[in-house]
Amino acid sequence: MKNDKMVRFLKNILVLIAVLPLLGSCIREDEVANSPQGNFEALWKIIDEQYCFLEYKQIDWDAIHDKYSRLITGSMSSEGLFEVLGNMLNELQDGHVNLASAHNVSYYDAWYQDYPRNFREDIVEDFYLGKASTDYRTAAGIKYKIFEDNIGYMRYESFSSGIGNGNLDEILSYLAPCSGLIIDVRNNGGGNVTNSERIAARFTNEKVLTGYIRHKTGKGHNDFSKPYPIELEPSNSIRWQKKTVVLTNRRSYSATNDFVNQMSCLPNVTIMGDKTGGGSGMPFTSELPNGWTVRFSASPHFNADMEQIEWGIEPDIKVNMDETDETKHIDTIIEKARAFLKGEWTPAVSE
């Protein structure tokens, strides 16, 4: 009996071993082919099923398929395929959408290229911040100083620069004597939203609802979860209690857009400058059969009124750089913020 059981056991093992290659071949047959057409279809399907703004942006993705599929040929080069796929992704008008290969990365940059710059780094660096050795301080990517009129100034160039609570304690302690504060996030293309939350938490004394987020739950364009609230918790450490102006332009994007949205919910904060660039979708990454990766917006973020902020956030006070000021090395937006904080300038409804 024992020998019979052993024989049956060995037969079962042999049958399983024989079947495994067949199972593997079945799985491979279901996979998308690593060909120009296969990679095109894979990319189109990823966006069709997972991109979160197709309905909001009123994009006919089926029509986009028809438009670009006719450009795909079996003999096209890798560079040619990349160009077609990159152009197709640009139809989404989303700065969070990139196609990355070994030889190139696609970008959509019309969200800021078609707008005024409203920022001159050389003017800020040379005529407002001054010399790094003597005129301003730097802590974890934040440059800060006290202007001669007792207005504090913080310049944060990227939310990718990590900022700790110890850094913020030192910065706010140093700026404490100031009568008002300017936070300049113009040309800040984003980074880590944890940093935006950590800074914003220094400007509220109570929990504040700042927005909502939804997640994809299915392949349909409108398959989303219920909205989940996003709340800003006040910091347990030093908190700023005086008036604050946040400076923005079209290149304020992604995590910066998130920061501006949070700050706009706070009572002592005024947003000044130009409309932000947007970028409210939480990015996600997927891979094509040929190994190229695609990044895209997968979860939409809304403001506290459940309004989309993908296209950007309007400032409370619209101010553009003045060309005459620029020739004199004057930053119009900084000067308006200083005058506003000192009570020397009351803006009209639309500047």
Which residues fall in each region the model found?
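Alpha-helix termination/capping residues and helix-transition junctions
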Residues: 20, 175-177, 238
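C-terminal "post-core" interaction segments
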Residues: 27-41, 58, 79, 151, ...
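Generic hydrophobic-segment detector
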Residues: 8, 14-16, 181, 281, ...
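Flexible, low-complexity junctional segments that flank or bridge functional domains
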Residues: 26-181, 185-215, 222-229, 243, ...
